[in-house]
Amino acid sequence: MVKVKVAINGYGTIGKRVADAIRLQPDMELIGVAKTSPNYEAFTAMRKGYKLYTTKENIQKFQNSGINVAGSIEDMIKDSDIIIDATPGGVGANYKKIYQEYGKKAIFQGGEKSDVADVSFSALCNYNDAINKNYIRVVSCNTTGILRVLCTINNFDKIEKVRGTIVRRAADPKEVKKGPINSIVADPARIPSHHAKDVLTVLKGIDIITSALVAPTTLMHLHTLFITTRNKVSKEDLLNILSNTPRILLLNTEKADAESTAEIMEIARDLGRYRNDVPETVIFEDSIYTNGNEIFLMYGVHQESIVVPENIDAIRASLNIMSRDESIRLTNETLKIGKGYLI
């Protein structure tokens, strides 16, 4: 099998996780990762045996820090078939010009504007729309969580309306300079939040309005959705379709005696998950409520890992390597992503 040569531009929260995921794919080869600062993440990448690349002007800086550099970012791009751009939001648009110059395909993250790519992507929703596309944007962690739930329900019964509230984590665990630490912030106070617009880049034409808050936590986001479907949907119907959908897990809070994002993460630790990651959308089963054609539910989104499998599937879609179902199945198997119940 000829393996796809994948480069990672940006080795932070998302980039390092995607790098590890690529190493587990039988049809992919990680040729290197790029960093612009010689910090602890660069040292850990070197310890893992990843080839490190940086900007031409920073090569000496890395070497002076004791970090071996394989070459410039341009060298890495030239040697790749496709690039995962996991640079900070807005930076990817600048790198796109370089990718185009070398005739390389690229996968961008949700921090970029949607017009950076040919298509915004969520594997369960619109994999086929991304086949053979040169530039794909994996939507943000929050939008990925929303879309997994909405597309699953929409495939069962057409959704007429969605209203939702996103309680965002204030920072990732490693981000010591972000907050708030003693406030809940309207983010933004105006309605709708950008999440509704982002959903519409994938699930087009749906009536959706969202609001968003930032809470002083680092663990996960928490969403509440109120959904109106065309026809009556029972709780039993929802439990059946959600429990049989990959990348969605249910948590029975009464049975597990767990009803918080902290306990979800603790379960991940106790199960020995790598980095304690939870790339699945975790729905509180007890929160699922139906009344005729109305649905209410709550779920947690692990912002550090939920988009990782989406990036892997986006690579296969862009290069037309596998069908939707084949790619999702292989990604889930290699990354040990489940369906059914968290515990």
From Swiss-Prot:
UniProt xrefs under SMART domains: Gp_dh_N
GO CC, alphabetical: cytoplasm
Predominant location category: cytoplasm
Catalytic activity: D-glyceraldehyde 3-phosphate + phosphate + NADP(+) = (2R)-3-phospho-glyceroyl phosphate + NADPH + H(+); D-glyceraldehyde 3-phosphate + phosphate + NAD(+) = (2R)-3-phospho-glyceroyl phosphate + NADH + H(+)
EC numbers: 1.2.1.59
Keyword entries, A-Z: Cytoplasm, Glycolysis, NAD, NADP, Oxidoreductase
Top-tier EC class: oxidoreductase
Listed pathway(s): Carbohydrate degradation; glycolysis; pyruvate from D-glyceraldehyde 3-phosphate: step 1/5
Sequence positions that bind D-glyceraldehyde 3-phosphate: 140-142, 195-196
Highest taxon listed in the record's lineage: Archaea
Catalytic residues in the record: 141
One BP annotation, GO: lysine biosynthetic process via diaminopimelate
Gene Ontology molecular function: 4-hydroxy-tetrahydrodipicolinate reductase; glyceraldehyde-3-phosphate dehydrogenase (NAD+) (phosphorylating) activity; glyceraldehyde-3-phosphate dehydrogenase (NADP+) (phosphorylating) activity; NAD binding; NADP binding
Binding residues for NAD(+): 13-14, 111, 169, 303
Cell location: Cytoplasm
Assembly: Homotetramer.
Membership in a protein family: Belongs to the glyceraldehyde-3-phosphate dehydrogenase family.
Protein name: Glyceraldehyde-3-phosphate dehydrogenase
